[in-house]
């Protein structure tokens, strides 16, 4: 299990955000996801193998939200739970356009040196979103990082949508790993595919995903760079 000190620190990050929501009424929901390859920012954290994820989400009044995700991560020498906690707030900027800001914390069982936190800001449209994440110590490697992403979901017909994603990860400062690609401090990842709605609360997605080289070096760099991922998500 994760050390109590790490759990307490991560929980405090979310609790700080929720304090402003007071006793407001909230909606709580969850999801269960199965994927042929669990990927984050184009890189596999399941060693190119199938994986399952459990998610819980809280939506409160005044745009406050928080949640948690539990998954299984495979490292070169270790494996264990991967926990993600997040919290933030959405505010309306103009009709059809919202802004958001929040915190996200990542923790890994048995390899706490990989734990890291990020702050993020974003713009949310009806069919798209744009976010930027900033970390002072990406994956505990001693480098600062900035990750920017654009996500699009475009309806094609009833129950079917095209999905797309492009992200850029840039690292700087600290000591660069000797395993990193010193020619480029930035890495791009893309995902293109389609999504099918299978009844209320169920979604099937098939997508091609790819990641370039460069950027901050992490334990995921040895994984396959291009693959096709099939995933099923069920909400409850």
Please describe what each predicted stretch is.
Residues 1-29:
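Cleavable N-terminal export/targeting peptides
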Residues 31-33, 55-59, 88-90, 122-124, ...:
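Transmembrane beta-barrel domains of outer membrane proteins
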Residues 48-52, 79-83, 113-119, 124, ...:
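Residues that define the transmembrane beta-barrel architecture of outer-membrane proteins
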Residues 34-40, 70-74, 91, 105-109, ...:
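Transmembrane beta-strands of outer-membrane beta-barrel pores
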Residues 126, 192-198, 202, 222-236:
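Outer-membrane beta-barrel "beta-signal"
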Residues 116-182:
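Detector for outer-membrane/organellar transmembrane beta-barrel domains
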Residues 25-74, 160, 167-168:
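Short glycine/proline- and aromatic-enriched beta-strand/turn motifs that initiate or cap beta-hairpins
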Residues 28-30, 62-66, 95-101, 127-132, ...:
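Repeated loop/turn-to-beta-strand initiation elements of outer-membrane beta-barrel proteins
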